[in-house]
Design a protein with these regions (language model features):
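Active-site metal-binding core of divalent-cation-utilizing nuclease and nuclease-like domains
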Residues: 1-3, 27-84, 95-98, 103-107, ...
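Short Cys/His-based metal-binding microdomains
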Residues: 1-24
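Domain-level recognition of nuclease-like catalytic cores that cleave nucleotide substrates
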Residues: 120-158
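Short, contiguous acidic/charged loop-to-helix segments that flank catalytic cores in large enzymes
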Residues: 15, 87-95
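Short amphipathic alpha-helical interaction elements and helix-loop-helix interfaces
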Residues: 17, 33-38, 66, 79, ...
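Generic recognition of stable, solvent-exposed alpha-helical segments in well-folded globular domains
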Residues: 19, 23-27, 99, 129
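Acidic carboxylate-rich catalytic motifs and surrounding loops in phosphoryl-/glycosyl-chemistry enzymes
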Residues: 41-47, 113-124
Length: 158
């Protein structure tokens, strides 16, 4: 163990980083699935038929997010005390902009999907756009649960 105890949180050489990413990606997927949003994991071809790079910038994609538009959610986990984030007031926002939006947003212009980076910090913080997307997913799940409850109540009373 290192003297500060943060090595496991920020080391790029261990499988912990990938495991942490996959667990949070699966959580985002489960939220969308609970809300009956029909999510897909790492959908290939999300950037359209003209994109030959075979990139999959959407860890979780939702085909029917808004009117005639889907949503590609790209999940990332960062450690705010890593050297690349020190001195940044909002590491999640900075990472979302430089590593996700700047890299992928232009590719979505001719796609049927919008793009939303959901960036978690190992300390628990979340970028603003990610928070908005997750709140919308929770609201969808809550609405779905409420409708199911009403349906079950009607079934019992008849």
């Amino acid at each position: 163990m290192d003297p500060l105890g943060d090595h496991p949180l920020c080391c790029n050489k261990s499988g912990d980083r990938i495991t942490r990413h996959n667990r949070l990606r699966n959580l985002v997927f489960k939220l969308a699935d609970t809300g009956l949003l029909a999510p897909e994991l790492e959908k290939l071809g999300i950037l359209g038929v003209t994109d030959k790079t075979r990139r999959r910038p959407g860890d979780v994609s939702i085909k029917s997010w808004s009117f005639r538009r889907g949503l590609a959610i790209d999940v990332a986990v960062i450690h705010p005390l890593a050297a690349s984030h020190l001195g940044k007031a909002e590491p999640c926002e900075s990472y979302a902009q430089t590593q996700k939006i700047d890299r992928y947003a232009a590719a979505f212009v001719h796609s049927d999907y919008d793009f939303a980076p959901v960036i978690f910090e190992t300390s628990g913080a979340l970028n603003k756009e990610g928070e908005t997307v997750l709140k919308q997913q929770v609201a969808s799940g809550t609405q779905t649960a409420s409708e199911t409850e009403k349906f079950n109540e009607n079934k019992v009373t008849k």
